[in-house]
A protein has these predicted regions:
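Residue(s) in the substrate-gating loop at a strand-loop-helix junction
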Residues: 140
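Active-site helix of classical SDR
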Residues: 120, 156, 164
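Conserved glycine-rich cofactor-binding loop
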Residues: 11-12
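Alpha-helical segment proximal to the catalytic Tyr-Lys
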Residues: 125, 169-173, 230
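Short C-terminal tail/terminal secondary-structure segment
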Residues: 145, 233-253
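Short, small/polar-rich loop/turn modules that mediate ligand/substrate recognition or access, typified
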Residues: 86, 172, 177, 232-234
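Substrate-binding pocket helix/loop in short-chain dehydrogenase/reductase
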Residues: 96-97, 101-106, 191, 202
Length: 253
């Protein structure tokens, strides 16, 4: 029996790379995304490539409890079990705290943090009963350090950075492992919409002189979801090309 993974934000960027990788490794994949048109298109393509019996798409608002519960019901109905949940859906907003309105703050927190609360409530009870399962959250190096002009994103990802520890402690006794991937600047369609000069600046700031590819993050997600990472739980794993390792102090001569 194939393993089954649910991937939120699963039809573009890092999520799409993860969906393709898990399918290529023999897993069943349930993709969830707010973008219904894109999701249906991706589903058609992946169904042709991997088989309609192994891949599903469900339109989902991960900040809404009913929508997440409907996703879980559909996943269990089609595949019978869920072995891993990849909480990848997320948004960001720019601005210092005083520049943000309340609705923007609430929207980012609901999508980036509350969504993990909702998917956990929907999927963990079955994992507890089966005494097995993995959860992988997409955090960010922005949760490990501060950024200019990104207060709510820093706050949201900082919450995810510590939430993983609490979840790992609570669910370890049931054989459930919980970890985060913490990407640095990643060449997703959204990031590539920046001017080329900005993208070049980011690449030059990396000790490796490169940016992260979505496939880099997807491979780490697969590792954390699989038995290959059996002793690892409660960890934040940077996939950043080294962006988070520099203190920012001037070079000493």
């Amino acid at each position: 029996m194939n393993n089954t993974v649910v991937i939120t934000g699963g039809v573009s960027g890092i999520g799409l790379s993860a969906s393709q990788l898990f399918l290529s490794r023999g897993w069943n994949v349930v993709m969830a995304d707010f973008n219904d048109a894109l999701g249906q298109d991706v589903h058609r393509k992946l169904s042709t490539q991997y088989g309609a019996d192994r891949v599903a798409f469900h339109q989902c608002d991960v900040s809404d409890a009913d929508s997440v519960n409907n996703l879980a019901e559909a996943a269990y109905q089609q595949f019978g079990h869920v072995d891993s949940v990849i909480n990848n859906a997320g948004i960001f907003a720019k601005g210092a705290v005083h520049e943000l309105d309340e609705s923007t703050w609430d929207r980012v927190m609901a999508t980036d943090v509350k969504s993990i609360f909702l998917t956990t409530k929907a999927f963990v009870p079955d994992m507890i009963e089966r005494k097995s399962g993995t959860i992988v959250n997409t955090a960010s190096i922005s949760g490990l350090q501060g950024d200019y002009n990104m207060a709510v994103y820093n706050a949201a990802k900082g919450a995810v950075v510590n939430l993983v520890r609490a979840m790992a402690l609570d669910y370890g006794k049931y054989g459930i492992r919980v970890n985060n991937v913490n990407p640095g600047p990643t060449l997703t369609p959204m990031f590539k919409s920046n001017p080329e000069s900005v993208i070049d600046e980011f690449a030059q700031a990396s000790p490796l002189g490169r940016l992260v590819e979505p496939d880099d993050v997807a491979r780490t997600m697969f590792f954390l979801a699989s038995d290959e990472s059996a002793p690892i739980t409660g960890e934040n794993i940077p996939v950043s090309a080294g962006f988070e390792i520099y203190s920012g102090q001037p070079v000493q001569q």
